[in-house]
Amino acid sequence: MRKILFFGLLSICFLFVFFFYKQKENKIIYNKIVEKFEDNVVIDETYTHLFKDSNLKELVFIKSRLIIPELEHKKMMKATGYRADAYRALSTVYKFDFKVHDNKILGFKSVIFEGFEDAKVSKHENNLPSEKWQQLKDFNIGDPNINEKFFHLEFPFVVKNTLCVTISKGFFKKIKKLKRLKIMLISNEDREYKIDIENFLPKYNL
């Protein structure tokens, strides 16, 4: 009788731990912002995954869509020229924001998505508009040395660093097929920040 009771309680504990782990892993904070200016609309959808056990505090996936009615017309979508090309490239933007807390200002020289180690990475500044955005292959991590003159400083407070990684629509479709998101960030100090979470991207209409 005692053995049955013991194994029964043990099973309940395992189920509770598993349920708690799944709840923790699947905790995604969703937010949607719609802004209008004149006849144009900007829609930002964010999906935030929180971490508790490391300096890497948040992974935020952002889908931004710009809707300009006059350029949504079929004829305009087939048009050529800088304005039409830029709109096609930028009408929908996908990006990850990685938020890392430290007592220093950090730069990130490399981002690796497991399974796509040979991805084509660009490192230009996140300035818009730019012809470089139209040439985005897989993803862009920005200039890792843009704050290089501050790297040696240490502060008596928490510095909230944000690495913005913009990904192409084609690369987004590839990582959306993964079962898990396994991503490694490498800082200017060669410190590694690893992510291994359930891939939440297929669950949403993105």
Curated annotation (Swiss-Prot):
Pfam families named in the record: BPTA
Source organism superkingdom: Bacteria
Keywords, sorted A to Z: Cell outer membrane, Membrane, Plasmid, Signal, Virulence
Subcellular location: Cell outer membrane
Signal peptide: 1-19
Transmembrane segments: none
UniProt keyword annotation of Membrane present: yes
Gene Ontology CC: one annotated term: cell outer membrane
Family: Belongs to the BptA family.
NCBIfam families associated with the record: VirAssocBptA (NF045772)
Function, in words: Virulence-associated protein essential for survival of the bacterium within the tick host and therefore within the natural life cycle of the spirochete.
Listed name of the protein: Protein BptA
